[in-house]
Amino acid sequence: MEERNIELDIRRWLDLSKSGKAKEAKDFYYENLFDTVIERFEKNNQQVISGSSVDVLISILGFSPEPIVLGAKLLKPKTHIIIHDAGVSLNEENNRIIGKYLTDYHFVELQDETFSCLYDTLKEQLSIHPAQHCVINITGGKKSMSASAGIFARDFFCDLIYVDYSKYDPSTRRPEPGSEFLNLVYSPYRDLPELFHK
């Protein structure tokens, strides 16, 4: 029954999106689809990151709050830090959706988007919140931010994740709801070049 209903809801969401009713489509998504998307994501991705619980999750926030919520709901970190640039902090939808679905997180605003600023901010956050198991979610970040975070993850023994998708609708420029999955981009336990890539 749930599968049939989500398929009907996806069609309804697509119809609203394609007919130019962007606000109605967005409202419909959050009212009728996102809870199911979260449930599926948690159910289908429990084994992606194995080992100890996540002490610190650092998420890079872009213009869509969904990857931040999905990553945090799945990983259930002890501490969740959401890093964003100045432009993103003005996005009311981000604040509303993150506040609705998550309860324990800290926002940190970047002074600028340079490599050194993001790298130093990540380093500062790990000194404030020491962690044995740190995960960085790069889904929302710009490419330059993702590159900085990737280098930082390598230097500081952090997992690097990306909320990806298997189905994409080009007309809405969004993933099909329910097709999201967790991509473990880098893991120091799996990917250290000197150990595993000879």
Where on the chain are the PLM-derived regions?
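Long, low-complexity, Lys/Arg-enriched
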Residues: 1-134, 144-198
